[in-house]
Amino acid sequence: MKTYIVIFTTLILLISCEKEDFNEGNIRIDKELIMQLNSKSYDTLIIESNKLVLDAYLWRDFMPISPPDGKTMISINWLRDIDSTEILDNIGLIEQYVIYNDSIWIAEYENETSTTQPDYKIKKRSREGPKWGPNICVDVISKICDSNSNNDYYIKIKDIYVERTD
């Protein structure tokens, strides 16, 4: 009987423990990582002759061909020079972090290039995100690489509304 009580108590304790770092695919619950990302990211970033900001558009598709609970999130990010100066070739968008409460969607950008963007913008897309929202606000942080210096930088934009497309 004592064995059952010990096993039962142990199970209860394990189940009730708070999970600080939960991973599900590319979605994490990690308050510490969110604090680290926020502490090293900037609203405006200056790299050589470029003064850069991040723009973002996120949505979930609820078109009739979509599942009843909608498709996963899609994100488009633009790195933009605020003076419309051509962005140097050594600067690139590498990875994005979409933050909602204590959860983070971490995604590398798709390997597509846009020929329709002006020289002062870089456009990158990520798919297969979480099914958060729609009609919520998230923060977006992007990891940028400067291949000349081999330095990574982080740039952010806050309170981006996640749209619903029908």
What are these regions (language model features)?
Residues 2-8:
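Sec-dependent signal peptide recognition
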Residues 76-80, 97, 141-143:
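Residue-level recognition of well-ordered beta-strand positions that form the cores
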Residues 51-82, 88:
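Contiguous beta-strand segments within globular domains
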Residues 13-16:
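C-terminal motif of bacterial Sec signal peptides marking the signal peptidase cleavage site
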Residues 20-44, 125-166:
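Surface-exposed edge beta-strand/loop patches
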Residues 88-94:
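Short flexible loop/turn segments that cap and initiate beta-strands
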Residues 82-86, 102-151:
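Short, solvent-exposed, Trp/other aromatic-anchored flexible loops in extracytoplasmic proteins
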Residues 46, 99-100:
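A general beta-strand register signal
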